[in-house]
């Protein structure tokens, strides 16, 4: 090959071998270079007292262990050279992106309903630029991480997530975050229909609602849409994987 010749294409230099991630219903073979760790909506709205879920009457008392597990998964992913993507749910300050009365989102979003019930909260919940919308301090993105805003439960709806993943040759999505039965499951389901392999790290997620909502979501994922694993299994599987370059 002439010294000035170039070959185009993402992943031409990727030499990492697949690892076998223990999961249900069966192990899943994955390469770090073809995998992204997805952190779903780890915002004050969903994980902090005084945030939207808390104000809407949902129990957020168990979110701190989830934050710790996600940090553990993030450390392993970054060490393996895996792409990290944060999803961030919310709307513009005027809530135009929320859809208005002509959208079912206006009628079903508990954040919007809470603000209508409590006018003193108007403009504070899931509004871009506000504390509620912000990611929790413990999970601040690092250089090389990607942040994808989203206006609905699914991270694929009206966002650049799909094109971001495809441009990097990513086929496997490892999910963490809140809420398992809402935004995590919605994004994983949509990914399934777009031919992505989705696996959720169960102990790095938390449901909105009672415990049976968590178990039902995990059952749906394991049985119909993807795989279920754990943070320890993820970390151990990729601990021996050689670090690969992440395209930015």
UniProtKB/Swiss-Prot annotation:
Pfam families in the cross-refs: Isochorismatase (PF00857)
Tagged with keyword Hydrolase: yes
Superkingdom classification of source: Bacteria
Enzyme class (EC, first level): hydrolase
Keyword annotations from UniProtKB, A to Z: Hydrolase
Catalytic activity field: (Z)-3-ureidoacrylate + H2O + H(+) = (Z)-3-aminoacrylate + NH4(+) + CO2; (Z)-3-ureidoacrylate + H2O = (Z)-3-aminoacrylate + carbamate + H(+); (Z)-2-methylureidoacrylate + H2O + H(+) = (Z)-2-methylaminoacrylate + NH4(+) + CO2
GO molecular function: hydrolase activity, acting on carbon-nitrogen (but not peptide) bonds, in linear amides
Enzyme Commission number(s) of this protein: 3.5.1.110
A GO BP entry: nitrogen utilization
Active-site residues, record numbering mapped to chain: 41 (proton acceptor), 150, 183 (nucleophile)
InterPro entries: Isochorismatase-like_dom, Isochorismatase-like_hydrls, Isochorismatase-like_sf, RutB
Record's function text: Hydrolyzes ureidoacrylate to form aminoacrylate and carbamate. The carbamate hydrolyzes spontaneously, thereby releasing one of the nitrogen atoms of the pyrimidine ring as ammonia and one of its carbon atoms as CO2.
Similarity section: Belongs to the isochorismatase family. RutB subfamily.
NCBIfam families: RutB
HAMAP family reported for this sequence: RutB
Protein name from the UniProt record: Ureidoacrylate amidohydrolase RutB
Lineage: Bacteria, Pseudomonadati, Pseudomonadota, Gammaproteobacteria, Pseudomonadales
């Amino acid at each position: 090959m002439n010294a000035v010749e170039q070959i185009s294409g993402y992943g031409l230099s990727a030499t990492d071998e697949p690892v076998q991630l223990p999961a249900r219903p069966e192990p899943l073979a994955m390469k770090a270079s073809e995998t992204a760790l997805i952190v779903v909506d780890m915002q004050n709205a969903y994980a902090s007292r005084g945030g939207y879920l808390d104000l809407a009457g949902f129990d957020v008392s168990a979110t701190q262990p989830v934050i710790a597990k996600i940090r553990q998964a993030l450390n392993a992913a970054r060490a393996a050279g895996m792409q990290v993507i944060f999803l961030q749910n919310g709307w513009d300050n005027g809530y135009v992106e929320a859809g208005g009365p002509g959208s079912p989102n206006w009628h079903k979003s508990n954040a919007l309903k809470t603000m209508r019930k409590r006018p003193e909260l108007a403009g504070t919940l899931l509004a871009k630029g506000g504390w509620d919308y912000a990611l929790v301090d413990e999970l601040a993105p690092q250089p090389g991480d990607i942040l994808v805003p989203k206006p609905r439960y699914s991270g694929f709806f009206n966002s650049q997530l799909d094109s971001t993943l495809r441009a990097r040759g990513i086929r496997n999505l490892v999910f963490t975050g809140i809420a398992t039965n809402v935004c995590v499951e919605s994004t994983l389901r949509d990914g399934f229909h777009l031919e992505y392999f989705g696996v959720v790290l169960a102990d790095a997620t938390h449901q909105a609602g009672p415990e049976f909502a968590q178990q039902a979501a995990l059952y749906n994922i394991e049985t119909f849409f993807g795989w279920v694993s754990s943070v320890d299994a993820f970390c151990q599987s990729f601990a021996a994987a050689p670090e690969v370059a992440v395209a930015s």
